[in-house]
Amino acid sequence: MSSVASEITVFFILILLGFLLKFKFNKPDFKNGLKLYILNIALPATIFISIVSVQINSKYLLFPLIALFFNIMIFFLSPVLLKISNITDARKKRTLFMLLASFAPGLSCFPIINEFLGYESLAKASIIDFGNKLFVLIFLFFVAFKFHNSNQNNTNNNNNKPINTIIKSLFLEPINIIIFMAILFLSSRSTINDIPILLIDLFSKIKDTLTPVVLIFIGLSIVFNRNVFKNILPLLFLRSGLCLLISTACMQITGFNLSEDIKLFIVLSLSSVSFWPFLHMTFVDNLEKNIEEEKKTFDTRYGLNFLAYSLPFSTITILSLFPNEQLLLNFNNVYFISISFLLIGIFLTIIFNPYRFKSKEKKSMDGINYIREFFTNKLETTQK
């Protein structure tokens, strides 16, 4: 067994360990505590070490724009995924519009990037993610209110307070603060050697805990509900296939040939969906607390289930692709994988929801029979 395959096997064992711990620690406080540690301590420490350990190139400043462009492209292609998956419920469609184009690489990708691609790739990923954060925090916030106003026929836009809260969240989030601090530190011509060794050792020790804690958290996040599973799994395959297809096409068109960058963008394109759109939907849901459930703008329960399945799906998918890293460096192979994901998503949609396709087929046959009867009657009238 190769060293990469061996390490990935260990990762899967940690996920399994987390899943088994789920039955021991079934209180939400345990899971929430792990999440707080990851997002507020382990990830910021790891990102800081990765950024100050590399030389930041001025071209890195374009990375957030690349992420923003990718988010917007997936957002406008989301109706295609919804059409393929036969989602007809308006509340679910709005919920998926919010989620499908969002990405959360911090939990699903950063530990893997840190382990397999190194400091420089993690530094790039952190800067790229800032563009994604602009999209999920600001753009999707306005989308949520647009859906709310349209659904409730509401023209009053008293959004100043929540907008201020969102902007504060953007700049006060620990990961973003660390990115700004690290970039300011490097822009002052300082290096990692200018940081006290005690602080470096502390951050390094915290960094070493990131991967196992995240993988255990992913194991804890795995849920099994047959009906929910059948509705969400096809969409996760469709989303991954579309994101992989677009990122690969963009890299080929722009002439990317750096192996580490190719692997980095492939991994990032397979990130799980972000929690931030769910917070926007929850905020809107609170505004609609006096409205009947079926008339609300979003289906927050469905959104929460989608989040719960997205994180383990993304991480397991990425880990499954890494044993043969050379596979990811051939664009034809990646195209094949992305198209396979799309076909699997379509196949699962048909298998899990056959009645939708049968009803469509029935409607189609009814239409054909109507046309046939119309022309038959017309012909008989003419002959008479």
Where are these regions (language model features)?
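Alpha-helical transmembrane segments of multi-pass small-molecule/ion transporters
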Residues: 1-384
